[in-house]
Amino acid sequence: MQEWFQNLFAATLGLGDLGITVGLVVSVIVKIVIILIPLILTVAYLTYFERKVIGFMQLRVGPNVTGPWGLIQPFADVFKLLFKEVTRPKLSNKALFYIGPIMSLAPSFAAWAVIPFNEEWVLTNINIGLLYILMITSLSVYGVIIAGWASNSKYSFLGAMRASAQSISYEIAMSAALVCVVMVSGSMNFSDIVAAQAKGIAGGSVFSWNWLPLFPIFIVYLISAVAETNRAPFDVAEGESEIVAGHHVEYSGFAFALFFLAEYIFMILIAALTSLMFLGGWLSPFPQSWGIVGTPSAFWMFAKMAAVLYWYLWIRATFPRYRYDQIMRLGWKVLIPIGFAYIVILGVWMISPLNLWK
């Protein structure tokens, strides 16, 4: 795509060297649009799917009035939020009040720059893709803290403190789990990590994916991922029964929609990261001898992401909310020790004769 745009502007339109630069910029913008528009539409219908799934689990119907089978409900929700007035507390910090939602949303968008959907569908294929993801997603907590403090509300500030402490705590456990994947893959490049899952003793099958040999750390990662996204049962940052709605209690209209969008984009990002790191990415679960069914493709990547997102919804509908002290105890006294212990165990395993990743 980049070469096509550069040829278009440099040769066809006669812009010369300037055309090469313009073509590069235009190709990047087009790639960003190709990622962002499906991503926003996915968020819209993820909310619809969530309400339908939870309604089914609770023996309800869910959205079924706006459009056929309620399919236009996400757009109705968007228009409702867009046309609502954005109000703010009189004593709040105006600049920081509006910067908070933007700082929460921007990292969740920027992280998609390095997420591949197959060997070719990636905006930027860098060797430190995993490190980039961990770095960029950790910035979103600043938006939460700023929003909670700038609102000048005790409920907002308490929710922001809870969210930031929880996010920082579970980032440690999640990072420990991802370190284990890097150890067995020998790379932080997502394409290399996926390729490594097709090798080893059980290479070419679903049993060679990282979820099986790293199963204990896979469970640690899944729990940490739910806590990182502040989803039920770890949604104490916005515990309605305790602190009304957490750090975005004072937000309305489009400003609230930005927080909402950031949360769901982060959910989809975690689903993509889970697929790449533990579930073989775009690798097929079937042997390649099965023809097109066994061929690696972006379809399998999307299917695995959908399965992880369904797991998110199932967890929300099944488990009650934990108390804040229980969440912090689980993170610091259970998941983090298990994560660090497994790093040591995995190191010994890899230098032993029982190494599965040779």
UniProtKB/Swiss-Prot annotation:
Describe its function.
Answer: NDH-1 shuttles electrons from NADH, via FMN and iron-sulfur (Fe-S) centers, to quinones in the respiratory chain. The immediate electron acceptor for the enzyme in this species is believed to be ubiquinone. Couples the redox reaction to proton translocation (for every two electrons transferred, four hydrogen ions are translocated across the cytoplasmic membrane), and thus conserves the redox energy in a proton gradient. This subunit may bind ubiquinone.
Assembly:
NDH-1 is composed of 14 different subunits. Subunits NuoA, H, J, K, L, M, N constitute the membrane sector of the complex.
Asked whether the UniProt record includes Acetylation among its keywords, one would answer no
> Which InterPro entries has this protein been placed in?
NADH_UbQ_OxRdtase_su1/FPO (IPR001694), NADH_UbQ_OxRdtase_su1_CS (IPR018086)
Tell me yes or no: is ATP-binding among this UniProt entry's keywords.
Answer: no
Species per Swiss-Prot/TrEMBL record = Neisseria meningitidis serogroup B (strain ATCC BAA-335 / MC58)
Provide the primary localization. Answer: membrane
Q: Which GO terms describe its molecular function?
A: oxidoreductase activity, acting on NAD(P)H, quinone or similar compound as acceptor; quinone binding
List S-S links within the chain: none
- Give the encoding gene's name: nuoH
Name where it's found: Cell inner membrane
E.C. no? 7.1.1.-
Q: Which regions form coiled coils?
A: none
Protein name (Swiss-Prot/TrEMBL): NADH-quinone oxidoreductase subunit H
